[in-house]
Each structure stands twice: as C-alpha cells, then as structure tokens.
UniProtKB/Swiss-Prot annotation:
HAMAP family: DNA_primase_DnaG_arc. This is DNA primase DnaG. Mg(2+) 2 binds at residues 234, 236. It comes from Thermoplasma acidophilum (strain ATCC 25905 / DSM 1728 / JCM 9062 / NBRC 15155 / AMRC-C165). Forms a ternary complex with MCM helicase and DNA. Component of the archaeal exosome complex. It is an enzyme of class 2 (transferase). The gene is dnaG. Transmembrane segments: none annotated. Binds two Mg(2+) per subunit. PROSITE patterns: TOPRIM. Keywords: DNA replication, DNA-directed RNA polymerase, Exosome, Magnesium, Metal-binding, Nucleotidyltransferase, Primosome, Transcription, Transferase. GO terms for molecular function: DNA-directed RNA polymerase activity; metal ion binding; poly(A) binding. Residues 186-260 form the Toprim domain.
Length: 448
C-alpha cells in the first residue's frame, strides 16, 4: 500500500517541482508508532532541524530564499502505525544537500509519537532532465536528417534529370531519342525507348538511340549499315520481338540483354556494364538460342557465309557420334566406347558453324568426359580427358576451337587465350570473373 501511495505521490510532487530551482530531490521514509498527520510531519522536519545546522542551512530561511522547495508529505495510517514519505526539493549543491538529508535522520519524534526517518535516496533531478533532452535531441536530429536527406536527394535528382534532359537529342527524320554522341561514334547502342536512353545517359553512355517500338525506323536501318551496332534490349518478350524485327530489316553486330524479366531503364550501373561487357556476337547469340531460321535468313540477306552444306564425308563421320544411351553402360563398355571414338574420329571433322552438330558432340563428350581441339577448318587435332585439358592445352598450344564435355572454368579460358584459341564450346560455365574480348565462350546454358 505504501508503494502505491508513494508512486502516486511522486507524480504529484513532480508537478509541483520548480524546474528553475530544483537540483536534487530528497526522499525520506517515515515510520511512527502512532497515528500522525501531514502537518505533524512537516512541523517535525522544521522544528527538530532548527538551529541544528546553523543559520546558513536553516530550513525556514532556505525556503524563504527559494533554495528549498515546498515539502510534500504522503502518509498512511494502519493498525495504530503510520508510514509514508516526505519529499524535499533542494536547490543547494551536493554537499549541502547531503548534510540536509543527513540532518533529517536525526528526527526521533513526530507529533506525540516516536518516529524514525531514513533517507531512501537523493535523486539528481538533472539526470532525468538530461535523459529527456537526449531522447528529444535524438528525435529532432533524426527528423532533421530525414528532411535533409530528402532535400539533398531531391536536389541531386532534379539537377541530374535536367542535365540528362538537356543532353538527350532528337535524331533523324523520325526525331528519335538519342544520346549526344550518336553523330560521331563509330559504334552505337540501339535500345527500345526514351527512358532506356535516359538511363544510359545517367551513367555516361551517350552513343544510344531508341527505336520507339517494334517498327524499326529508317534512320536506324541506315545507321546499322554504317556503324557497329549493339542491340541492347529488355529481358522480356518485347525485347525478343524487337530483335527479330531488327534482323529482318536492319543489321546488327552484337546483342546485349537485360536480366530476364527486367527492362533496360531499370538497370543499375553495374548491371549495364556487365550486360555490355558480355555482349554476344549476333551469329553466336542466334545459334545459342536455337534461332536457326533467323540465323539462316540473316546470314543470307547480309551475304554472310555461315557454315556450309556438309559433304558426304562429313555426314558419314558425323553418324559415328551417337546420342548417349538412356542407361549408362558399364565401366568396361565406357572405356571401350571411348577408345573407339578417339580412334575413329582422330582424323575427323566437325562442322563448328552448325549449332546442332556442336551440341550433339558436346553431349557425347560429356558422356565420355573428353575434350577435343579443332583447327579453323573443323578438323580435329587431338583429344584428351577433361581432367587433363588445362595441362595439355598449355603444353601444346595449337588449334582454333575447343569442344569439351566438361565445365568451362576460368583457368581453361586463361590457358586457352594464352594458347591462341579463339572459341570454347562446352556444356556448362563455372565461376567466370573475366573473359578476354578476343575469345568466344559459349555454353549450352549461357554464354560470355
């Protein structure tokens, strides 16, 4: 009960505390062996400390001068006894407040009853004030930062947008959105819309032009015959349609795509750089994605020689390579088949420009765990197990193309590049961190 009283009383006291006066709050616990009232407690405090501490610390004089606040008392009487608290606000320094608190414990009578006074604590009121100040300052600081960041970001964004808008130009008869370098650059990047051009401008790429839909403008058709063209498209069906239209009416040298399901206008700087760095030559892109009809039509229309009709010898030797069986053969059969394959095709040919034939060969080599090296005419120079590929290529740097049934690793790319290899075809890509621009790397899952 005393606890409840003291808590509620504390609220009352804090409302009466003068914040300009109080430094410390003396909390004295009171016990009497009889029933007393509040005026008895206040009278005992003033009466029994009078003259005890000298004139400088006389409670009446201190209260008149404002150095001691109003004494608040909360007591409760039960079963002939009284307990409670007295709270004394002090504007004195630490030493004087401590002396005053100690003097209160000399009180031995309150009214007609024996009494005992104990100092429960002396609380530094300024600590709570400081804590409130800290909490409030944190909130104010957070609000300031939030508004400041918003303002800063807004200013930067506004300036950037204005700069980008001032840089974008209208090009050609169709007034196509384009970057300011479109007139002078030997290579151009063809994108879908105005926002794509703006996004690339934001990261300093200025040789861009937008087709504004699937109907390729005459301006872009003309530019494609004069410049090196990279088609940089969204990773969705719309990008596929624009690419097909581009192949039918214009020319393209490389293809770069946004990640599946994303648009060029959404890409970050890192994503843009990665996509353009690993752009794929148009013929390799079409073959890799199974667009054989488009590849054939594109090649014929642009008078390109992409592969040749296989002669009878090629067909006969290609038939030796069979599709891998559904059930893997026993180890003895694998070794025998591997030996036969190497023997029969030691002097064989592979149409390296025929994606279907290359794919079949990779599947067969994956079953055999073998790697083969071919010259530029598609004639096989030698073959060896996948595990020996890096060592064998570094020891005998011959050939133009590697076809492997294993994983294309970074080490294999590095060694092949040093050996003068131009193409690597494989089943899967390992962890690739860099690829020289002079070597083509194609896996049937993805390409670099």
């Amino acid at each position: 009960m005393v606890m409840l009283i003291s808590l509620s009383f504390k609220k009352v006291i804090w409302m009466n505390v003068d914040p300009n006066l109080t430094k410390y709050m003396i909390k004295a616990k009171i016990y009497t062996d009889g029933v007393v009232e509040k005026p008895d407690v206040v009278g005992a405090i003033f009466g029994q400390t009078e003259g005890l501490l000298g004139d400088d610390l006389d409670l009446r004089d201190l209260q008149k001068s404002g150095k001691i606040g109003r004494i608040e008392v909360e007591i409760d009487s039960k079963k002939g006894r009284t307990e409670g608290y007295a709270l004394i606000p002090s504007g004195l320094d630490q030493v004087e407040t401590a002396i005053l608190a100690a003097a209160l414990e000399t009180i031995d009578r309150i009214g007609p009853c024996k009494a005992k006074v104990e100092i429960a604590n002396v609380e530094d009121v300024r600590v709570q004030k400081r804590q409130k100040i800290i909490e409030r300052a944190k909130k104010i600081y957070q609000d300031m930062n939030s508004k400041g960041d918003d303002l800063s970001e807004s200013l930067v964004k506004s300036v950037r947008e204005e700069v980008e808008k001032s840089e974008i130009i209208s090009y050609g008869e169709e007034k196509l959105p384009a970057g300011p370098a479109i007139n002078d650059s030997d290579s151009i990047i063809v994108v879908e819309g105005r926002n794509d051009v703006l996004n690339l401008l934001k990261y300093g790429i200025k040789n861009t032009i937008a087709v504004q839909g699937t109907n390729i403008p005459e301006t872009v058709k003309k530019l494609s015959k004069e410049r090196t063209v990279t088609v940089f498209l969204d990773g969705d069906r719309g990008g596929d349609l624009i690419l097909k239209e581009m192949l039918q009416v214009a020319e393209a040298d490389f293809v770069a795509r946004a990640p599946p399901g994303t648009e060029v206008e959404e890409l970050t700087y890192k994503q843009i750089v990665k996509a353009l760095r690993y752009k794929t030559p148009i013929d390799q892109y079409l073959s890799m994605h199974g667009m054989n009809d488009e590849l054939k039509e594109y090649s014929q229309r642009n008078n390109l020689v992409f592969g040749s009709q296989p002669n009878n010898n090629h067909e006969a030797k290609a038939e030796v390579i069979e599709e891998p069986p559904e059930q893997p053969p026993k180890n003895e059969e694998i070794r025998e088949e591997q030996s036969q394959q190497v023997t029969v095709q030691k002097e064989g040919f592979l149409d390296l420009l025929n994606p279907h034939e290359v794919s079949k060969r990779i599947e067969a080599l994956a079953q055999l765990k073998m790697t083969e090296v071919y010259d530029s005419n598609g004639e096989r120079i030698f073959s060896f197990p996948v595990s020996e590929a890096v060592e064998r290529i570094s020891q005998d740097p011959r050939g133009n193309t590697i076809v492997t049934g294993g994983i294309i690793s970074q080490r294999l790319i590095d060694v092949s590049y040093n050996a003068g290899i131009k193409n690597i075809y494989g089943l899967k890509l390992g962890h690739i961190t860099k690829k020289p621009v002079d070597i083509n790397v194609i896996a049937w899952e993805r390409s670099l």
